[in-house]
Amino acid sequence: MPPTNGEGGSQQPQQQQQQQQQQQQQQQQQQQQQQGGSGSSDFVRKLYKMLEDPSYHSVVRWSDDGDSFVVLENEKFTKTILPKHFKHSNFASFVRQLNKYDFHKVRHNDENGESPYGRDAWEFKHPEFRADRKDNLDNIRRKAPAPRKQQQSEEAFNASQQQIAALSESLQATQQQLQALQQQCYELEKTNRLLVSEVMTLQKMVKAQNQASNEIINHLGSMEDRRRNNRGATQAAPNFHAGAMSFLTDGAEEPAPELRRARELLSVVGPDLQANRELERLYMTYNQNGAPAEPAATNSSAVMFTQAAAPGTQATAPGMPLVHNPLNDPQNMMYPVAQTPSIDPSFHTDQMHNMPYSRPLSNPAVVAETSSSQITPSQITPPPKDQMSSMWRDKKPRVLLVEDDKTCARIGAKFLSTLDCGVDTAGDGLEAVERINQDSTRFDLIFMDIIMPNMDGVSATAMIRMVSPHVPIIAMTSNIRGEDINTYFQYGMNDVLAKPFTRDNMSRLLRRHLAHLLKDPQSAASTGIVLTTDDLTLAGQTAGPATTGVGVGVAGAPSGGAHGPGPPAQHQQGYAMAPPTTMQPAPPQVKFEQSPTAAPAPGLDPSSAAAAPTWQSTNPAGVQLQPPPPPTPTQPSPTSAAPPAGLDPASAVAAAAAAAAAAAAAAASMTPGGYLAAAPPPPPPPGAMVLTPAGTPTGVGHPAPSGAGSAAGARGPPGPGPVGPGSVVDDSRPEKRQRLMQGGYASVSGHGHGHPGVGVAGFVQ
C-alpha cells in the first residue's frame, strides 16, 4: 500500500536531517584535511585527479614505474594546467607547496646527469603517492612545524630577558659610580676653593706682618741713630779725640747687628711671584665662575675646612655661596637613558657574569651638586717640575754613594735624587778610591758603606783622606755602638747614618754637612743629632786591657791617635819615630775582626794619651763618647826589647818585625771557630806597599810588643792593613767570619802575644 499523506509528511523531515548530517560530516572532513587531520588534503586529491586526466599526458603524467609524476613541459604546465586546478600563478610556488607536503624532486645520478624524460623535465616523488594506491592519499599530510623552532624562540626570549636585566643592572651601577665621582669632584672642588681662599688670606696676613716688621725695624733704627747722636753731642771737648775714637770703634757708622740681621731675614723670606700670580688667577677664576652648591652636611668632611678656619678670618671667598639648590641635584644631571635599551646582537649570556659591578652606595640620597660652569683641566694646570722649590742654591751637590748591596744602593740613590742631588754609585771601596783618584774635587759628600768586597769602607776612607782631607764622609752601617763609631771617626769619617735609613735622616745629614750650598743656611741649624747616647754603647765598656801591636794605617792613612787627625805626612813621621816597645792603650773591642789602631805621638805617656780628649772621643755630632780605659802593664817579651845602642830605628823595626813573624809562625794553631790559622809570610820592610788577596795596596805594620796575655787569652788587635798576625775572627759572628774567609782572608790567633800589625783590608761588621 502506498503511504498515506501523514506517513509521507513524517518521512520528509527525516531525509532532510540526514542530508544535513552528511553535509556537516563533509565540512568536518574538509576542515580536518585543511588542518592536517585524518582525511587527505584537497591539494593532494587535485594533484591525483589531474594526473588521471589523459588529456594532460603530454604535459604532466605518471612515471614509468608509477611511483612519481613528471612535469614534461614547464611552460605549458604553468600557463594552462595550474590556473585550472590550483591557485598558484607560477611554477615556483607550486614547487614550494609540494615541499610542504613532503614531495621531493628526483635527482638522477647518471653519467650525463639528465632525466630520461627530457632535459627540462621535473620529477617529484612521495613514498605514499603512487598511481595504483589511491587509498594512500589520506596518509599524505602537510608537514607540521618543528617544535625545536618554538623552543629556540623561547630560549632566545629568555636570553633577551636576561640581557635586558643585566644591562639594566649595569646601567644602574654605572649611574651610581657616576654619582660617586660627581660627589668626589664636588668635594675636591669645594676644598680647593677653600684652600685657595685661605692661602690668599694668609698671604695678606704675612704681607701685613712684613710691613709691620719693617716699620718696627725702621723705628728702632731711627731711635738708635738718635741715641748715638745724643751721646756724641754730650761728650766733653778735652776728651774729643778719645771720644771720637771710641765712637768710631763702637760702630756708630753701622746699625745695630740685630737690626741688620732682621732686615736680612725679611729680605730673604720673599714671596714667590709666580706662585702668587697662579693663586690670583685661580682666585679670580673661582669668583667669576661661581661656587657649587653645598649638599646637606651629613658627614664631617663637608665642614672640615670650615671648622679649621682661623677665628677672625673669612672662611670662604666672596661670591662663593654654600646654599643647597635642588635644581643642581646630580640625579637630575644624569645622562639620558632610553626607555627600551637596545641589545647588542653579539652579546651572549656567558658574558653577563664577567661584567664588573660596583657596590651600591650606602646612602645614595647624599649626592653632589656641580656648578653651572665647570672648570676645564686646561684652566687649572700644575706648575712645571723645574719650577719646584729646591733647598740648594745654584750648584747642586754631587754625592758619591759607595754600597755593594744593589737594593740599598737603589734606595739611597732614589732618596738623593728626590733631594735634588747628583748621584754617582760605587760597588766597593776600591772603586770609590779610583773615582777619587780620577777627580778629587768632583764630589761634595760621600756615603760610605763599611762591609764591602775588595776594600772595606774604613780602609777606603783612610786612602781617600790622603787625597781629599776635607770632603765629608758619612758611614752607612747598622753598628752604631760607641766603640764602632770611635773607629769610624778615627779613620777620617765625619758622621754616621744608621741603617735602615730614611729620606729624612739622609736629608738631615746633607743639610748639616753641606750647609754652604743651601739657599737658607739657617735651616741646617735645626737638624738634630742622628746618634743619641741611648743608641751608643760607650767606648771602653766591653774592651779589656791587652797589649797591642802598633800598625801603620792603610797606605799611610791618618789615624786618630793622641794628636787627632792631621796631614798624612805628620802621621807617617810619628809612626816612624815611635819606638817598637811603646805601650799603647787597647782600642775598643768593636765588631770588626781587626780593629785598626795607631801609635801615640812620641813623648806622650800612654795613660795621658788615653785620657786626653781627642777627636776620636767626640764625634762631629757632639755626642760625648767615653775614651777607652788605660791598659794593664805587662811584662815585655824578649822579642820586643829595646833596640841596642847604635842601631837606627828602621833597622830596629825590621828586626823586631822578623822576630815577631817567626814567633807567629811557630804559634799557628786552630782558631776558636775551628779554622786552621795559617802562618804569616815574612813581613816586608816598613813603609813598603803590599797587596791584599783582593788586590788592595796597604801599608806594612810596625812590629808590636808581645805580652803575656790574660787568662782568657787576650789578643792584641792588629794595625790597619790586610789580615795578618794578631787578628782573630770573632767566633760569635759566624756569618761575618764566613764572609771574611770567602773574600780570601786568613785568620791567625794571637794566643796572648802581640804580633806585627800587618793591618786589615776587609773589616767585618
From Swiss-Prot:
InterPro entries per UniProt: CheY-like_superfamily, HSF_DNA-bd, Sig_transdc_resp-reg_receiver, WH-like_DNA-bd_sf, WH_DNA-bd_sf
Pfam family, one: Response_reg
Spans annotated as Hydrophobic repeat HR-A/B: 160-220
Comp. bias regions, Pro residues: 626-636
Compartments (UniProt record): Nucleus
GO cellular component, one term: nucleus
Compositionally biased tracts (Low complexity): 11-35, 569-584, 637-647, 699-715
MF GO annotations: DNA-binding transcription factor activity; identical protein binding; sequence-specific DNA binding
Residue ranges of the region described as DNA-binding domain: 40-145
Region: Transactivation domain, residue numbers: 542-765
Region: Disordered, residue numbers: 1-42, 371-391, 550-647, 686-765
One GO BP: phosphorelay signal transduction system
Residue stretches of biased makeup (Gly residues): 550-564, 755-765
Coiled coil: 157-198
Record-listed 4-aspartylphosphate modification sites: D449
Domain Response regulatory: 398-514
Primary localization: nucleus
Family that this chain belongs to: Belongs to the SKN7 family.
Entry remark concerning the domains of this protein: Homotrimerization occurs through formation of a three-stranded coiled-coil structure generated by intermolecular interactions between HR-A/B regions allowing DNA-binding activity.
Subunit comment: Homotrimer.
Stated name of the protein: Transcription factor SKN7
Natural source organism: Chaetomium thermophilum (strain DSM 1495 / CBS 144.50 / IMI 039719) (Thermochaetoides thermophila)
Organism classification: Eukaryota, Fungi, Dikarya, Ascomycota, Pezizomycotina
Name of the encoding gene: SKN7
